[in-house]
């Protein structure tokens, strides 16, 4: 018989969790947000991060967090089960439209052309939000710092005559987890109108997950009230983490508490509870 002190510890047992001070919500105007943060960051390797993502966490650089807002649970972690995914007619058109793009996967690294595209994207899509003024250091801290298995993917047109690289269209950062791929951030050429690069990028990740034998693509948070998040509801089937469990989510019918309802915080994996 195994003595209780000899039982294996949860891989998260060395972590601590705390709640941040309130700050303005970046998704819902006029709302106040808080995050629950997992620390210390140097202990969060790929295996531990996989468990955290399954519990609704995300990362920004080496900062690992999940929403922990008072009176709101509008952010629903979502993922696509790639084996069951069926593209819509529109998604099939987007796939065919951009299939000539050349994807190159590499370790995270700084590239001046990537940074220039990032700044054009932020200025066009998120002007006045603060990120349109990101310095190179801020860009690197946000997207190029990672202690887990992360990759940078650039999408270009076919090489030009003479061997010059094709025009850069999109850059995506992804994490490779034990059970899937996790979309970190994607930015693309803002002057290309009606391209649906973001949709194509998710379709590409779904195909990559299939080729790697990974069952899921994690898309971060879906927020019903946020138009910027609406595209995530177009992938079927879609699973959402509600009340601590992943289940197939019907965005049109799922019963979510009103934004002002009392917060119901999901338990941490391994039996931890959040502070604050």
Curated annotation (Swiss-Prot):
One of its GO terms (molecular function) is leucyl-tRNA--protein transferase activity. Its main location: cytoplasm. One of its GO terms (biological process) is ubiquitin-dependent protein catabolic process via the N-end rule pathway. It is an enzyme of class 2 (transferase). One of its GO terms (cellular component) is cytoplasm. It catalyses: N-terminal L-glutamyl-[protein] + L-leucyl-tRNA(Leu) = N-terminal L-leucyl-L-glutamyl-[protein] + tRNA(Leu) + H(+); N-terminal L-aspartyl-[protein] + L-leucyl-tRNA(Leu) = N-terminal L-leucyl-L-aspartyl-[protein] + tRNA(Leu) + H(+). This is Aspartate/glutamate leucyltransferase. It comes from Burkholderia ambifaria (strain MC40-6). The lineage of its organism: Bacteria, Pseudomonadati, Pseudomonadota, Betaproteobacteria, Burkholderiales. The gene is bpt.
């Amino acid at each position: 018989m195994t003595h209780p002190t000899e039982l294996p510890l949860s891989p998260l047992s060395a972590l601590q969790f705390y709640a941040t001070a309130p700050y303005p919500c970046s998704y819902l105007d006029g709302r106040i947000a808080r995050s629950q943060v997992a620390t210390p960051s140097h202990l969060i390797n790929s295996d531990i991060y996989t468990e955290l993502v399954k519990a609704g966490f995300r990362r920004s650089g080496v900062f690992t967090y999940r929403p922990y807002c008072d009176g709101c649970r509008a952010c629903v972690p979502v993922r696509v089960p790639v084996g069951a995914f069926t593209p819509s007619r529109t998604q099939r058109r987007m796939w065919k439209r951009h299939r000539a793009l050349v994807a190159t996967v590499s370790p995270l690294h700084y590239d001046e052309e990537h940074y220039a595209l990032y700044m054009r994207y932020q200025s066009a899509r998120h002007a006045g939000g603060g990120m349109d003024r990101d310095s190179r250091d801020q860009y690197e801290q946000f997207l190029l710092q990672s202690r887990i298995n992360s990759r940078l993917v650039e999408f270009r047109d076919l090489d030009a005559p003479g061997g010059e690289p094709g025009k850069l269209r999109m850059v995506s950062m992804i994490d490779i987890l034990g059970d899937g791929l996790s979309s970190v951030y994607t930015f693309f050429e803002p002057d290309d109108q009606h391209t649906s690069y973001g949709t194509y990028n998710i379709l590409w990740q779904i195909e990559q997950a299939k080729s790697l034998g990974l069952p899921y693509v994690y898309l971060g948070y879906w927020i019903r009230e946020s138009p910027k998040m609406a595209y995530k509801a177009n992938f079927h089937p879609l699973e959402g983490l509600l009340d601590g469990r992943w289940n197939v989510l019907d965005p049109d019918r799922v019963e979510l508490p009103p934004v002002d309802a009392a917060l119901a915080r999901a338990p941490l994996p391994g039996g931890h509870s959040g502070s604050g």
